[in-house]
Structure formats: C-alpha cells, structure tokens
Amino acid sequence: METPTGSGRPSRMATPRLSERKRQLFGSPRSRLRQINDDEDDADVDSLGVLPLKTHVAANRKGRSLFAAVPGKSSSSANSSPETNKENKKTRGGVMTATAEQLPQLFTATMRLNSNSSSNSRNSSPRQTRVQRKRADSSMSSPTSSSEGTPSSRARNSIRRSPRTFSAQKDPDAFSSPESFQTRLSKVAAMLMKGQDSRSMLEKSKKKHNHSLKTTAQVHTTKPKKTSPAEESQSDDEKPSSSKNSRKNTEVRETRSSQIISPKTRNRRRPFTSADINCKTLKAAAHLHENMRSYDEEKTAAVKLENSRSRSKSPVEVFKSNDDAVKRNTGNTNNKTAKSSEVATAKRPESPGSSMKIDVEVPESDEEASNHKPQKRQHPETSTPVAPSADADSGSPQSKMRKVTLSSSIPTMAFYSHSGEAVTKSRRRPSISKNSLKQPTKISPTSRPLLGINKGVHHKIRKRHGFANRLPATDMDNILNSLSNERLKNLITTKREERAKVEEVHQILRNAKDPIKMAKPLSVIEADDANNNNNLPATAWQETSADFSDLSDVEDIDPIIEVEPIIPIIRHEPVQKSPTAEPADLSKRKFFKSGRRSSTCMEVRITDNIRASVSQGKIELVQTIRRKPRQVRVKSATIFSAEQATVDAILKNLDDTVVDEIVEANPVVQATPIDAEETTMETESLPDIIEYAPEANDVEIDPFAEFRQRLPYQTDDPNVVEQQQILLEFLISNNICTEKNFEIFIANPDDYKDEANQIVDNLYMVVNSEEAAQLAQMETVENTAVAIAPKQDAPAVEEVQPKLFPIFTQRLQPVVQKSLRRRPDTSMRLLTAAGGSNQYQIDAGQKAFGARQCQQCGLVYTVHEPEEELLHREYHNSIHVLRFKGWIDEDIVSVYPEWASDGRIIRINERAPTARLDRLRDLIGVVDKELGYSSYIVPKIFVAFIAVRKQQIVGFCLVQPLSQAHRFIQVDGTDYFSEESYPASCGVSRIWVSPLQRRSGIASKLLRVVQCHTVLGQEIARECIAFSTPTDDGRALARQFTGLDNFLTYDQ
C-alpha cells in the first residue's frame, strides 16, 4: 500500500495476517509457488495491505497511481490503517477535482464504487447458492475485513450476481439521484466536446482486448502459473486502462480462477463487470450508444457460439464448425435487435473495456479467428466447483489448497492414443479443417496387417524393400567359362542342374493351387509354359516366397540367403539281371510317382516269412517257391497194411517227418528261406542251377519214363494202381529205381518181402549213421553229380552212400537250426513246469485255469483250487513282512552294491533284542508257507542271515550248529539217506529267495556268507555244510555249491 504523496505522514507498513505469515514461513512447496510473481504484479499485493517478504520499491509505483498529482487521493482498503480509514470517510462524500485527461478514469472509478455499495444486500438475495452465502458470511466475519467490504471483494461479488437481479442490485445512488447523473453526463459531454473521440477510445480498448486474448492463448500453451491469494483478491479500482501486458496476464489468471461455474448455475449466473455499467450509462449519448451496441452484438453472437461449443459433448464437431459458425454469426450481428442483444449479453457479456476475461476467448473477426490458436476443450464438471471468493483472502483452509481450474487441468482423454493426437494437433495448428480430421491415423509399416495380439503396438523398424532387385545378377556362365579346372567345372555344372531340378519342383508346388493335381512327373509338366521354371526370369525364384507378416525381419531383408530344403537325389546301381520295365501310362499315374524308370529291385523283410519287393514304383509280396504236391500221404499208411507187406514194412520203419521230406517229387527247384542280405547273391547263382538241373534230369528221364509207362502193372484196380504209383515215386526220389527194385516193390511184391524190408532198413540206417558226414558233404559236392543214380544192389548202395546222397539227404532228416523264437522268461518256465506234461484239469471253457504266478508276491499257484488259492492269499497278505527299512545297529557281514545302493546281508542270532526276534519269527512263518513246512520250528541256537535289497527282504538263510550228518542218495527218483554218519560243521535249516529275485545269485552269496561268518575266525569247508530235507531247487543248489551228488543232509 502506498501513502498518497504530500500527506505529511511517514510511510507505514501493514502487519501481515497470521495465516499469511504461517504460509510464508512454513508453507509447502505448493503454497510457495503461489508467492512467485513477476515484478509487475507487486502492486496487486500492496492493494491488499499484505507486504511479501521482499524489498518493496515505492519509487517504481508512481505510474500505477491513478491520481498521483492529487493530494486528496486515497485508496479504500479493508486492511488499511485507522488513519487511512478516517481519511477515506472524509473524502468519500466530497468532490474530487481532476484534470480533463483524468476524467474518463475518474468516471469509471466512481461508477465502480457506487455500483458495488450494495454488496450487503446481495448477500441476502434468495437466488444465491449455498456456497456463495457461505463465502459471503466468511468474508463478512473475516477479522481483517471491514463491514463494508473491500472494493475487490465487491467487484468479485458483483460478478456472481444473477442476471435477473441485475437492475435491482445496482447502486441506488447511481440511478436514483438525478443530480449525480446529470453531473456525470455533463462531464462526459465536456470530454467529448474537447475532442476526445469515444470511437478512438473504443478502438484503443479493442486493441487492448485483442492483446489480452493473445496473451490468454499464450497462457494456455505454456505451463500455467500458480497465483497467490493476494493476486486473486485484487480490487478493480486499481486496474487502470494503461496497465502493462504482464498486468493483463494477471487479469486473465484471475478471470480463469474466479469464473468456474457449475453446469447447474451457469445460465443463472452472469459475469457483471464495470464495463457493463459503462454500456448502460452511455446510452444517453446516441452515437456512442450505437457504437457500443454494434460492438456488443458482435461479441454476444460470438459468446453464444462459444457457449454452445462448451456444452457440446463432441469436441470434434466444435472444431469442424468453428470457421463457418463464426462467419455466420459475424454476418448476422448487424441484423439482430437490441432486445436479443441484451438477452444474450445477460447470459455471458463481454465489453472491450473490461479487463475480466471469460473462459472461452472469442475472436474479433475472421482474421483473428484464424490467427490465434484454439483453446483446450472445456469439460463440464460433475462436482460443485470451488470458486475463489473473499474467504481466500481471510486465510481460510481452502486458500491453502491449490486452485484447480479447467485451464490448468489435463483432460482424461489425453491419456489415450486416439485422443492424445487430437489434442496435440489442436495445440500446434492454428486451425483444423474437416479434411485433416477425417484422415485416418497412419500405421507403419503399411504392408503389415494389424494382428490382434499386437494391436496398437508399433515400432520404428523399417523393412528394406527392393533389396533383392538392387543386387546385380550373377552370371554363372562367365564364371564357368573362366574356370580352368575341368573337374571343378563339371562339379559346379552338375550341382546347378540338380539345384535347378529341385527348384523346379519347389516352384511347381508353390504355384499350384491344388498340389494333388500337380503331382505329376516332371516330363509331363515340363511342356506347360505356365509352370515351366525355365521360362521364368533369373531373379524370379528369389521373390516367389509369400510375404508373411509374422516372419522375422531378417528373412525379409535378405531373401537371397534363404536356403530351401534340398531334396536328396538317390542313385541306385542297377543289377545285372532286372525285369523289363513296361511303358507307364502317364494318365494313370498314382499320387507322387516319378516318371523315372528305375531298374532297382529292392527287397524288404516284413517278418520272418513275409518279404516284399519294390520294383517299377510298385510294392509286391515275394512269393515263396511252391513245392510240388506231395504224392506220398500219411493216409496211405493204413491202406497198404493189409494188402502189401513191403509197403507196410516201409511205412512202419519211417517216421512222419521222414516221410514228409522223402516224398518230394522235384526237390532241386525248391529254394530254402534266406536272409535279405543274401538275396542278391542267391539270385545271381540260381540261374546256374536252373540251367544245369534240366540237363541232368534229361539223362535220367528216359529210364524213369520207361518205368512210368509200365503203370498200371497187371491190374485194373484203382487202389492197386495208386499203390504202384506211390512206390514208383518212392524209388525214383531215392534214386534206387532199377529193374530189380521195380520187380521187388511193384511187379512181384509178395515174393520179395524180405528183400524189400532189407532195402528199407539199410536205407534208414545209412541215413542215421552218416548224418554228420552228409551234412558236411552238402556244401562240397558238385551239383552235376546229383542226378547220377547207380544201378547196383543193396550191398553196393551201402558202400557208396556218402557219394549217392549229397543233397537229397538234406530233406530226409530235419537239419538242426537255431530257433528264431526268443527264450521264454522265468515266469513262463515256471508256468510250464507247474502245468507239467500231463493234464490234470479239464478245459471246459473257463476264463482261467492252471498254474499262475502272482506279479506282486511271485508265488506260483493253481487257479480254482481252494487249497492253492488259500495258500496264495495267506502268503500275499503276509508280504508286508518282507518290507525292511533297516535297524540302527545292524550286523552287516557283506555289502553288494550291484544289487542296489542298500544291497547287504545282515546277521542276527538268538541274543538279539526281542523285537528283532519277533520280526524273525514272522519272516520264518512266511518262508515256511512257501517251502511247505508244517510247523514253524526255530532252533534254540541259530544264526540267521537276511539279504536286503531296496528296503525289501529278498533272501533268508537259517543256520544251526551240527556235528554229524548223512549222505544224500537218490535211487529212481526217490530220496534216501545213508545209514553211515559223517562229520559236519553246520546245518542249513532253511534257505529261501524271493520268487521275483531268483536266478540272480542271491542263494550262492548267502551260502558263501554262511561259510565265512558262521563260526568266528574259521571258514567252513563246503563239503562240511549239511542241508535239511531239500526241495528240488534246494537239491540243485546243494549239488552246485558243494560239487557233490551225495552231499550231506540231515533231518531236523
């Protein structure tokens, strides 16, 4: 606050309020930011009577005083000193003298004071909101405010008045007193007569208003400053029209913070400024009234447009209709009536002389509308806004909070991508056209489709398009011509051809819409120009791959390096002899069959007896060479028993298997089963046998044919004829078909029965005695000597037998071959042994019968026998006894890690704890059930050995001391003991191994432990260990361990 010049008093500083001092000393950073002001804004703080904590230069504030040269000028403030209040009371009712230049400012200040004198009556207005009444009461009860109120508070209260009570709430002195009204009119007329044109003043104020609009736009784009409560409570009577631009910025901030009006009271409240009083007062001057009305109508139309924009929900529509609506409103301004102008002004007035700006700036003309930047969108508030009032000056808690205004807030839609771009564009561009808003957002790259999972995610990596086209084509012909190495050139040429073929196949499959239709040989497709790879350009194969958007960028950048899977070219070496290839019908080609005619015959073994060959693209089963039908059958054995003694003797001495092999008509043609590896070798050597065999047969066919022509021999009986044919084939097959043998077997069999039996017996004995020699000679004797048949008698045949039967004797006796069947496991052998060779049960269709081995306990028992099933049930239920988790102080005598990690043998004797002895008795009970012992006899002195594997008892041996035993004797399957006694060291009472763990050497290891750890410090000889009543398996174990058939045994 400044003391008027010439008052004669010393300058006095007002004491700051306690809340203001607390805010300055202990305020938060947010409250400190409100104290940051420009140097030009210091006068606003002085008008409140509050001095900030910085140096105040009074010399720089001379130009800010309205009546600096008048000694009687004083400012009316609620925070001034008592002397100043007395002076104000003296000068308030007096006449102030001023010069002509100061007359307009004097008139304006006077009208403001008179119009604001009725602020007390406004507080009791029935149309006020609850928040306004509360603020008015707080301002009235402020300890630093006077009963009349400060001019700034009255000015602010006048802004919030309802439009309906505008004329009723005016100062009655301003309109009721005709003297004051005439005096003011005379002063205005004197001002106009002296040459001060009001039009020039309007233009000047108009320019100032435009400048404030630009400054307001700058406030929007820059970061809004946080104003202090001192600036918000500045009075209007200290706002001269010649203030600086910084002063206008402060006024803009005041207006934005003071005019936050809720949507419900937006239409009822009206910003009422001193400029509106000037408009009403200057209606007496006709030409001035016309100028003001035209200007108000223009501003009112723009304000109505902005009101409709602020209430609209779509910000895009406001921007679209911005230019057109402003033009239409500007053109229709002069045609509106005064009544519509007053009604529109009552809603939201704006005058050129007013320094209070509303939220939405209105451009003056089309040029200004296109020059200044559009404002931020106005969002209607859902909650009741807190407008600044007089309680902010009184240090209320609301004044300590930051003033949140629409201008300084960020809209919620700015956090989203679709609305963030619109906001930034509206800030950067001065005007937005319809075409720019309708353009869709460009997404890069454009060729990539928007996938669902990556929708909205973009990156700045760009693909390199056309990289393959920029590379120079490689001329392979020039490179090959420049090579001097012929071997390398041929290799490259061959590889190029193979690669071309492979690429041709891939190109055909890529271009084919239906791959099944295109699965033809290359020779058929080669003539098709559309699919011929040779007609394509050199670089076409590089671009054949489809542009998949989900592939990596590396594949798109360098498609030349992309290596496709190469189809291997398989070359087969042709064999010497192959079947002729028939011309293939291309129209009847099967799926994916090539046109290459291969002479390779591949053979695959499917099973032991089934083989398949692949030739000419077809797979066929290899047919085994069929034997000729046997002419000697078993049923003929009973036919000749009554009629011919010779045939009866022959069939009596021959086995069924011998008959099956002997009676083959032409065994030379037969081929034995061979492995797949020997197929090629046998196939090549087979033609020699086929070529030479008929020649040998041709030599011997003549006598055999002669014998066949004799049949039937002296009979017409069909049964006898059949017998003669069978006997002749028997003689021919054994190469003993001579005249003498023909007479003995066919012509006169009744007279030569003894000779026939002798011949058959000799033949059978020779085969049995010379079997080894004949098997060795099969591989060494030449094939040409096969067909030679000696014409000798029986003794001669007996001498040359090794030479007469090199091959045919192979089929007389079955050759011992290695069995192809796998060896049966232990369970199968147990089942076979349990079943036996005799049938004790009748198979009447039961689901299961016979011997069975339990998979859990390993016991073999007979199904559907009550005794066997009961035994198995008891043994199976007692299997838990075999579970052994170990003891604390075990007497481990041997460790076997090959069994398991815990494989060991434990020793226990009769001096063990009671719990261990009870566990031993349970174990002996389980063992005796399987061994067949009737009573569980435990000796008084004993040593037991337990084999443990994987926390399971798998073996058990119970040893007792023994001094003498008997020898084991077995006669005709019956076990006997010798009467003599022999010395013994110990006796094995029981030795048992789990059925599932047998045949793994556990019993032998138990006996070895008995030999070494039964007697302390002494190893017992194996011959001195006796066994008690062994079973069949125990007998075999004892013989194997002791090496004696008559081992020691005893009866306990």
From Swiss-Prot:
Membership in a protein family: Belongs to the acetyltransferase family. ECO subfamily.
Listed name of the protein: N-acetyltransferase eco
One Pfam family named in its UniProt record: zf-C2H2_3
Amino acid composition bias (Polar residues), ranges on this chain: 99-113, 329-343, 395-405, 432-447
Described function: Acetyltransferase required for the establishment of sister chromatid cohesion and couple the processes of cohesion and DNA replication to ensure that only sister chromatids become paired together. In contrast to the structural cohesins, the deposition and establishment factors are required only during S phase.
Main location: nucleus
Domain of life per record: Eukaryota
Encoding gene per record: eco
Species the sequence originates in: Drosophila melanogaster
Top EC category: transferase
Segments forming domain N-acetyltransferase: 906-1052
Taxonomic classification: Eukaryota, Metazoa, Ecdysozoa, Arthropoda, Hexapoda
Gene Ontology CC annotations of this record: chromatin; nucleus
